[in-house]
Amino acid sequence: MAFKLPNLPYAYDALEPYIDQRTMEFHHDKHHNTYVTKLNATVEGTELEHQSLADMIANLDKVPEAMRMSVRNNGGGHFNHSLFWEILSPNSEEKGGVIDDIKAQWGTLDEFKNEFANKATTLFGSGWTWLVVNDGKLEIVTTPNQDNPLTEGKTPILLFDVWEHAYYLKYQNKRPDYMTAFWNIVNWKKVDELYQAAK
């Protein structure tokens, strides 16, 4: 069964002015689609073709060595972007159990955002910043390239794309501005669903 590029759950221009239509078109239709195409080419005709992407990434050490790097990069790229589209929304409301637990752990939502932003804006090169559930607790982590916290047994519930292709058309080298804009379009309802399922 071939992996498929998911449809966006909103229009390309729905996240404006925070993420522009042109960026969304390139990011989804070109970058994400390339990961899917390369992943399918890697796993075609193997047992991995019938495995879930989450299982494949969580058990990367069991992927045959000849395919491991491609699955790590392209499978990771497909998984990460698929989740990223889901946790974005033009209708962002800061509520839910995850918000309460963030406040309980960090003191305030702003303190959490500050720590998350600091990790995102100081990450060298390309990668992702994540809010994960690790042994029932919330934790902010970063990964390089298309790596994923699933490989370390952590469950991702929120993620921020730090690759330049995610923001350069609009923000150029101003990664902190892109980070600030991100909070206006977080789908906290989806984040909370993922959190409740992971606890």
UniProtKB/Swiss-Prot annotation:
One of its GO terms (molecular function) is superoxide dismutase activity. Fe(3+) binds at residues 27, 81, 161, 165. One of its GO terms (biological process) is removal of superoxide radicals. The keyword Metal-binding applies. The keyword Iron applies. Belongs to the iron/manganese superoxide dismutase family. Destroys superoxide anion radicals which are normally produced within the cells and which are toxic to biological systems. Catalyzes the dismutation of superoxide anion radicals into O2 and H2O2 by successive reduction and oxidation of the transition metal ion at the active site. May play a role in maintaining cell viability during the late-exponential and stationary phases of growth since it becomes a major source of activity under oxidative stress. Has a role in resisting external superoxide stress. Involved in acid tolerance and the acid-adaptive response. This is Superoxide dismutase [Mn/Fe] 2. It comes from Staphylococcus aureus (strain NCTC 8325 / PS 47). The lineage of its organism: Bacteria, Bacillati, Bacillota, Bacilli, Bacillales. The gene is sodM.
